[in-house]
Amino acid sequence: MAPPHRHHNFRPENVYKRAEDLIAVGQRNAALETLYELITSKRIRYLAVQDLEPIALLLIELAVDLRKGKLAKDALHQYKKNVQLSENGLESVQVIVRKFIELAEKKLEEAQAKADVKIDQGEVEDLEAAQTPESILLSAVSNADSADRTERELVNPWLRFLWEALRAVLDILRNNSKLEVTYSAIVNQAFQFCLKFNRKAEFRRLCELLRGHMQSVTTQIKPTGSMNAIDLSDSETVQRYLDQRFAQLNISVKLELWQESFRSVDDVHTLITASKKAPRPVMMANYYENLGRIFAVSGNSLYHAAAWNKFFNLYCQSPNATDDELSHYASILVLATLSVPQKSLNSNETVVDDHKAKNAKLTSLLNLNQVPTRDTLLKSIVSRSILSFVDPAVKQLFTVLEEDEFHPLTIKKKVSEVFQLIESNKDYKQYIPTLTEAILIRLYQQVSQVYETVKLDFLVSLGIIEGTEFSLSALEVENLIVNGVKDGHLSLTIDHETDVVTLKSKPFEDAFTDSLTSKLQISPSELVRSQLSKLAQTLSSSAKVIDPEYEVRIQKTRNEALKNAIADMAREQQEIADRVNVMEERKRIADKAKREQDEEAARLRQEANVAEQKAEQERILAEQERRNLEKLERERQLVKEKEKLKIAEEINAKGIIKLDLNNLDDLDTEKLRIMQIEQLNKDKKDLEERLKVLSKKNDHTERAFRRYELQYLEKDAEKQQEDDIKNYETLKELKISKAKKDHEESLALKDRLQRIVPDFEPFKKIIDEKHSSKLAELRKEAQAALEQAKRERTERVKHQRMDELMERREYERKEAEQEEIKRKRQEEMDKFKEELRIQKEKDADSLRRRQEMANESAKPATPEPVPAPVPAAAAAAAKPSAPLTFAEKMRLKRLGKPGN
């Protein structure tokens, strides 16, 4: 513990009490400075967190009241630095930052209520921008009401303070696994702040801030002993970051910040790609829906339609999807697909596309394997029978444009009729301009196949679709034609002097473009390209007529080539399979070696980490024990000194004995306590005597007061009784008069209404007959709705019970598998115990034989007569027939003798 301060003891409770005293006398700034000095001091690192938390909370309250945002931010950073190694330090940090945001929001609400003004984006464009002299002069000379300016002066500072508080808290909580939950909650609060107050500039800064936090997480090099680092391999962590990015995407779309929305989409896609767990279908559907809106704003109709296609694929699988919603989204998908224009006529696939990288990026955002096209989207709509869900007007438009014959001169009338039906729906109406552009481009492409020169008025008349809200003017149609030429959809020139349009045809350069548009007749380019193929067909037919065996030879040659190709293919397939097997085996061996190497390295690192952590823990424990002992000793001495000083001050306060506070070394606490007790006894005796005299005096005085006031109390009671009787009579008369008046008015009203009864009865009968059929129809509709609800309820309960049955069966299957695993483990354990018992018996038998052999070898040798030599065969027959044990063989081997 740190040494005592020269003015007051360095203890949290003393500082807290000092701050409360300063607040009580109105010195809030001084109290804030006192708390700030304690929180930022390094001496609090070894104090208990529960002692520091109330001080930090009081500091935050004062900082919010005084609007000291920078001081609160510095204090929170230092507080986190000092307590983060404690047991509950980070939990305390979370409590304090939540309190900080809560107080700031409360102050903003109070300022709004006091000013009674609704915050608008137009008032302050940027909360972080400083006021310029021009803005101050402009506000001073403006015609705005002074009350409005006062209201904004009350609200805007707290709005700016809350924004700074959110940024500071996010900076404190970032990149710490134990603070993830609170970090996510504060991020959501910041999003709601930007949405509620329409803060577009602040939302952009917030997104950049979060993007920087995420980048620091993904690029950080995680050291061996790093504490509380963010682990992106954890599914819950990744899901939490995904939820944040999806919320960011939704808010950016609501604020119509489309560039920020696209960046948010990129962030979401990066997290989805890095995540090992697939996100929920609801989140992905929301992702594709917002992506479609972004593409619609950017004017990219192809990827807008592709995004709606992905969205509809997910939405139609939802069990909560209704028929109306399916029809709505299917109609939007078909309209978006039909709005995609035909491919540009000058888009040659042999030439590198300038937008290849961009298209690849957009394709990856939609999780597609290849770049979408209009034809693939149309085929998808037809193959999945999406047209069965769409609105009849949209289905009619699809039939007119894709299934019926597209005639340039009659298509305008058909499309106009369908557009009039589509305009009734505000969601469908927004696709009419893009549909008009796509239809006119296709119309002019087919006109260019028939005519070489036409009048400009003729083309303009074909492009004006009348009867719709979005009908184009002549100038707009001409502008569309020029843009079509610029984008490569059309090839023509306009002579404004003669109002003649020349439709160009390049037979040697348009080989690729004819397949992109529907053909009305054979074009010159096709005639030029087909000459060689026709000549080859004619020569082949002539050769067959001249030489009849030519076809036989060709067929024979083809069969031999096919036979050789099949044989070579089988051989090559076998070689490829063998090569693949060899490569897989090498890869498996290399992977195994690498895995073993990694496991060994990981084991060594783990052992080193364990040893290092153990040594560090021992060092920390020893250091902590030493500090605790020193702390206890200092506290013991400090308590003694404080107690001695306190007793001396109390004795001096009595005024009977005067002690020198600077010279108390000769006195101990026992002597001072005895002196204090004597003084207290004396004071107690004096007080009792004074109280006795005062009590007797008060008794006599009270008795005299009561005797004197008795005569006045009787008079007052009589007067009160008379007043009550008068009030009662007055109230009674008022009630009677009011009742008579109400009765007379009721009788008069009855007489007036009695005259209209003969007219009311027939009128009531007519009304009842008029609405009887409508009432019956409403009852019928209500009954039908009830029956439909019953059927839906029955189906839902049926599905629910089926799901419960499947879950129960799955649970029983898993239980059976667990029982089987336990049984097999028990059998293996029994088998192992039996083998162990047999091995122990063998070892015991071997030990017994070894002891017997040792005993036999220790016996003294007795002299025996030399036997006569016997034949080798007889000697061999005389040997015992029992085989040697393993122990005997090993003993003979050590002695250098053969074991058999």
UniProtKB/Swiss-Prot annotation:
Alphabetized PROSITE patterns for the sequence: PCI (PS50250)
Region Disordered: start-end pairs: 808-883
Cellular component GO terms, alphabetical: cytoplasmic stress granule; eukaryotic 43S preinitiation complex; eukaryotic 48S preinitiation complex; eukaryotic translation initiation factor 3 complex, eIF3e; eukaryotic translation initiation factor 3 complex, eIF3m; multi-eIF complex
InterPro entries: EIF3A, eIF3a_PCI_TPR-like, PCI_dom
Coiled-coil spans in chain: 96-129, 551-859
Gene3D superfamilies: 1.25.40.860, UVR domain (4.10.860.10)
Subcellular locations according to the entry: Cytoplasm
Keywords from the UniProt entry: Coiled coil, Cytoplasm, Initiation factor, Protein biosynthesis, RNA-binding
Domain PCI: 326-508
Gene Ontology terms describing biological process: formation of cytoplasmic translation initiation complex; translation reinitiation
Keyword hit for Phosphoprotein: no
Skewed-composition ranges (Basic and acidic residues): 808-853
GO molecular function, one term: translation initiation factor activity
Quaternary assembly: Component of the eukaryotic translation initiation factor 3 (eIF-3) complex.
UniProt cross-references to PANTHER family, sorted A to Z: EUKARYOTIC TRANSLATION INITIATION FACTOR 3 SUBUNIT A, EUKARYOTIC TRANSLATION INITIATION FACTOR 3, THETA SUBUNIT
Primary role: RNA-binding component of the eukaryotic translation initiation factor 3 (eIF-3) complex, which is involved in protein synthesis of a specialized repertoire of mRNAs and, together with other initiation factors, stimulates binding of mRNA and methionyl-tRNAi to the 40S ribosome. The eIF-3 complex specifically targets and initiates translation of a subset of mRNAs involved in cell proliferation.
Family listed: Belongs to the eIF-3 subunit A family.
Protein name per the record: Eukaryotic translation initiation factor 3 subunit A
